Amino acid sequence: MLPDGVVDVLFEDAHKQEVLRHQLIQQLISHGYQLVNPPMIEFTESLLSGASEDLKRQTFKIIDQLTGRLMGIRADITPQILRIDAHHGGDGIARYCYAGDVIHTLPSGLFGSRTPLQLGAEIFGCEYIAADIELIDVLFSMLNSLEMSAALHVDLGHVAIFKRLAELAVLSESDTEQLMQLYANKNLPELKQVCQALPLGSDFYTLARFGHDIANLLGRLSENAQQDAQIVTAIDELQRLKAHLQVQWQCAVSIDVTELSGYHYHTGIVFNGYINSETQPLVRGGRFDGMKSNQLATNQPRQATGFSMDVSRLLAHTQLDAPVIVLVDYDAFKDLGSEQLQLLLQQVASLRQQGYRVTMPLTAKDIPVGMTHRLSLVDNQWQLHAV
């Protein structure tokens, strides 16, 4: 019996998943991203350093039998990339990619997996929006190469707008959390009432009421907000990224500046990519801070941006070419002499190099599932024919 949210990936699905993983990683490598493969387990002081409460809850903990110290089984690979960059990233721009299993204590959503195959890419050391645009371009290049059955819809946000307003209004932690909860619940009537008692309350309400209209959002904010460089920059970044997605990738884009689910982790642009009517995003990404680098005199966090996805979520939206499954005629080869057998093995090797799946049967009843072709001996020549 398997736990809820844990499934076997079998046969053609397992083959498809591995093909997709390999194809996507090769795409990332071809764009200049360095492949890394961190371990499944780490001591929690490094694995969960600076982690959100949600990530801590999602992480299984175990006791190291060698040292007695607490270890965690990774629930997300990104914190491991932060550690790797802090030790090896230097002070220049660094690009990383990865693909590996992660394990969650709880599933994401009603039918979510607790064992995703997480694949992602990240850029460290570049504070400019050019890095976010590059990642978007890489993501769409990857997905377009798969010829997916449906188009991706992207929902953009920018946590820096709300963060800066909260700083200007000197909001307490409880007021900040209350606003975030009201935003998440889309509760405009209660939000309006709460905002009446807050400094810059009209701005916080405007984010929820008009935040989707990014072209006109700045003009609806208060004069203080309109003159704040951080808010102006954030809105400009959203407009530029939205325009790039629409022009370069003909992508449907929506804006939600009150999408703050990663508020305690993200620092700027955030995006979720959805497909069809699925409620859980296929891909998540955004800006965040790396660790303070051991190699930098300033000891400042490295700015970073990245995205990740669960490769198994792609299975339902992609198709591979139907495999050619070949069975060698058992009766024809079981009594072959060594010279004739060697010729057969050479032909089998040639077929396998061409991508055919060739089974050399052990008995007459050894027939592969889904067989499409048979390799038979006709007039002393091995010939391939469909069945």
From Swiss-Prot:
Subcellular location, principal: cytoplasm
Pfam family, one: tRNA-synt_His
Database matches in SUPFAM superfamilies: Class II aaRS and biotin synthetases
Stated name of the protein: ATP phosphoribosyltransferase regulatory subunit
Subunit comment: Heteromultimer composed of HisG and HisZ subunits.
Keyword Cytoplasm: yes
Function text: Required for the first step of histidine biosynthesis. May allow the feedback regulation of ATP phosphoribosyltransferase activity by histidine.
Domain of life according to the entry: Bacteria
Any one GO molecular function term: histidine-tRNA ligase activity
